[in-house]
Amino acid sequence: MKKITVLLTILFIGLGLRAQVVDSAQLLIKYVPKLANSNKINQQAVLNDTVVSEQMEFNYVIAPNKPDLDFAPGDMQVGKLNPEVKERYYRNYIKVGFGYPITPLAELSMHNCQNPKYSYGLNFHHFSSWAEPIGKVQKKFAYAPTSDTRLNLFFNRIFKNHTLYSSVGYNHELANLYGYSKDWVLPEIYPNPDLYYSKEYRDSIKNNFNHLGVEIGLRSNYTAEEKRLKEDVRVNYDFIHTYWKNIEHGVGLKGMLAYDAKFLKISGFQHYQVDLGIDYFNNVWNDSVPMGTDGSLLRRRADNSFMFELKPTMSFSIREYHLTLGIGVPILSQFNKTQCPVYPVAEVQMGLIRGILNLYVGVDGRSSYTSLKDLLYENPYVKPNIDTLRFTKSQISLFGGVKGKITDKMNYHVSARYSYRRDLPFFMLDTASLLKNQFDVVYATKGTELDVNANLSWEAINHLYLSLNARYHDFFFLDDYDWFESNAITGGKPLYIPRWEIGFEGKYIWQSRYIFTANAKVGFNRWALVPTVSPVYYTDESGTEVPLLDENGNPVKGIAYNVENDIHRNPDGEKSSVKPVLNFGVGFEYLITKQFTAFANINNIGCQYATNYYGFNNFGINVIVGVTYSFGNEAIKPLRKKTSATPKY
């Protein structure tokens, strides 16, 4: 019996050992964060550089704001450039389209053939709208055509260890002031209301501007593994000239020095970096100031602003843990006043579950100049001679977030930022303008800003890509004496900024030939300054407010202003005239051949274009169709030298 028991014990142990499969499970998922911004859903056409993929995309959607044409490159990345030029599938394309109502589109992109030393080409884009207002709602507003024409030339010279890059860009933006509503042009206030809808008067309220941008720089091609000093230095110049002869010169110098080293001979690295920035702005305004002892001499007023910033940082990395420490030292000079809003730089990144759950928290700051160029691109309907340009400072900005993958085809990213801001700019309807169709810029002296963003990107099935974005954006003003708290018109509300924004975009590729796209954007809970026509009151000798009467005994009417919200009723219980932002569109592309593509887009189906700044519905629905022709993949044959043949007799 004892022997049987021993044999059975050995047998069970053997079976158990056999059932135990020795293997290692590794949750290693390569994660590439895909950050999407809901504002990108409605961006206008961009000239995609085809070097990054073989399949070219031609997406076009109307944007509620004018596109930003900043000729300065993005953030400098250390040691990421491969000195070899990638071969293009098609290095050139031309795109033409025409839409309803009267919206021509033209694009051209050209690039030289594969060359290990040189890279040069051009990008051209034009989109405009010239149709008269269409529909019952649109006809309440005056005719306000727009046009956007951009040209960018670039040239790069690639050496063994460095790359010389340069570009020259020009943009002409045509924008009439917002199409003012006929509800405001009343005979009681304006003796000849038809005058304001004539072509002669419309030409007098143009707000066109020209932008010239030049950039030249030199950066190293070393990778992070090479123990060499990396550098990137560039000089840029921006010139703005408006229809009202306001001028802005902007000159900048950006520099970066970095060095990478191993961290104590273990699996980590040290990264040392110093960023240098110098910016100078010269603004010349069309209004004149008296000069001389008797004030008889007039000179165009000019403002000068200067910014110098030095930011040294150190980064340490061990596996999935990263630490960055540094300090930012900006020096700001404006109106004979110098400021130095120093801010800390610190960030911790932790890969809690590698590729699945990554956490980061940090603190930083920023100082930037509210330039005329930035204001015109964000809102081209600002008033002329807007001479209240300032530096916006943020000395403490706390941020954090989580990102990773839920599945192999689903990425997520949630981030939040809480900042203490000074001199934060906001747009406000210019109450001094005759037709209430242009905007001023006001500043909150002190306040805090909360910005929370969430993104979910998902490849639901093969060739079906979905992205959902959400944003919560709010402001809290701290200074009891700042503009918002002291001015009774606004009631201390941040104007024209939706507190909530939700965006969606999707793409489906069927049979590698048909591409279907859809996008949507919703923005709500925003405040706006709404002009209304109401009787004029005055205070009599007894202190009582009584209506002002004309010679016939009729009440005199004037313009009053209410601060209204798109989801809240007015204090009198009436529904607000401010509507939420609602914009969605669909698109279709048919890849006829490898070179020909036909496309059709329906934009602004909700007819809410250009309503970011209260109810100026200049544009309705837009349908645009066109074709794209790609070329430039053919082999370039070398030229043969011509030889003179000897005639035979």
Regions from the PLM with identified roles:
Residues 129-132, 138-146, 165-230, 234-250:
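Flexible loop and strand-edge segments within Gram-negative outer membrane beta-barrel domains
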Residues 108-112, 122, 151-157, 214-222, ...:
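Residues on the lipid-exposed face of transmembrane beta-strands in outer-membrane beta-barrel proteins
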Residues 203-219, 234, 239-321:
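Outer-membrane beta-barrel transmembrane domain signature of Gram-negative proteins
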Residues 113-134, 268-286, 301-333, 463, ...:
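Surface-exposed extracellular loop regions of Gram-negative outer-membrane beta-barrel proteins
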Residues 10-18:
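Hydrophobic h-region of N-terminal signal peptides that target proteins for export
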Residues 89, 94-97, 322-324, 330-649:
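Exposed, low-structure sequence patches enriched in small/polar residues
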Residues 75-76, 85-94, 98-136, 145-149:
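Outer-membrane beta-barrel translocator/receptor signature
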Residues 19-84, 642-649:
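N-terminal periplasmic/intermembrane-space "pro-region" immediately following the signal or transit peptide
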